[in-house]
Amino acid sequence: MMARCRRFARTTITRAGTLLAAMSLLLLAGHARAEPVKIRAGWVVAPASLIPVLFAKQGLARHQGKSYVLEPVYFSASPAQITAMSVGELEIAALGFSSFPFAVQNAGLADLRIIADEIQDGGKDNFSTHYMVKKDSGIATVADLKGKVLATNGVGTGVHMAMRAMLQRSGLQDKRDYTVIEAPFPTMKAVLLDGKADLIVSTTPFVFDPELQAKGRVLFTQRDAMGTSELSFWTAREGFIGKNRAAMVDLLEDSLRAVRWYLDPANRTEAIEILARFLKQPPARFESWIFTRNDFYRDPDGLVNLEALQSNIDLMRQLGIINADLDARKHANLELVGEAAQRLK
């Protein structure tokens, strides 16, 4: 009798221990599932990219800290984002038409997917990058640039590619017919007015400088050279999207809510104050252009203009910048941002 009782007690204890262990595992699994996904997102220039201030307004990021945690990461240029993505140090890279093909074809990121739009040059008749000469230069047409010095922010950049395309249309070839120098965007006005270059590239906010407006003239725009340009869009690797789809849709929902808040004229004063604080600039510097038609186009639904992007990439191929064709649609996954936009209706 006593032996039977001892066996019963041992069995009961064993079963109880097993049950407790199973419950502990379930609790741990539940805790693991509840941990928000860390999403590191790269950005290069603000306010062209809103990533560093996306959720500065309280109440916009309703899923932040629940299903995901957004961590903005600054980079000096797009190639650095590609490197970070390659080694698993970045979940979202903000790339453009001029850098995306290199990520896929040169860096081996064949699984990189385009997931949401950021800014477009010349989209919906919004601002397009200016290529400017001095009013008294005597340069009236693109053909007049033969033998001249042209300034770009960097050889191989998107604005340099547009410059090459426009001049090639007039029969002018790089090195043979003109000289290209490099200069940062903030110095472009001085480069032009001091006579160091005959043509400069100017974009927001520098293009609205009163002295540049008074002494300079737009010879052509980037839209004139190549139509609408996909300057920046979000990309992520297919494997990360598959494992964290719900969190990604939540992030995109919050980001669309934030972009729409910034674009709403009713919020413009507060939006400018946020940017001014972050960039340590006076609000007056943004008032004439930010979040208006004088700014780059931002799609409120986050939809990438794939037709424009394909045209941009095809031009790169024609100019010999890339060595193989690339089908943008095969590398796009806009289902997530579409689902996010539906939630906001």
Placement of each model-derived feature along the sequence:
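Sec/Tat signal peptide C-region and signal peptidase I cleavage site
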Residues: 28-34
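Conserved C-terminal helix/tail region of periplasmic/extracytoplasmic solute-binding proteins
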Residues: 313-345
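N-terminal secretory signal peptides that target proteins for export/translocation
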Residues: 1-12
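Bacterial N-terminal signal peptides
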Residues: 15-28
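Short, glycine-/small- and polar/acidic-enriched structural segments
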Residues: 35-173, 179-182, 198-201, 228
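Pocket-lining segment of extracytoplasmic ligand-binding domains
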Residues: 98, 137, 186-278
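Secondary-structure end/capping motifs
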Residues: 242-323
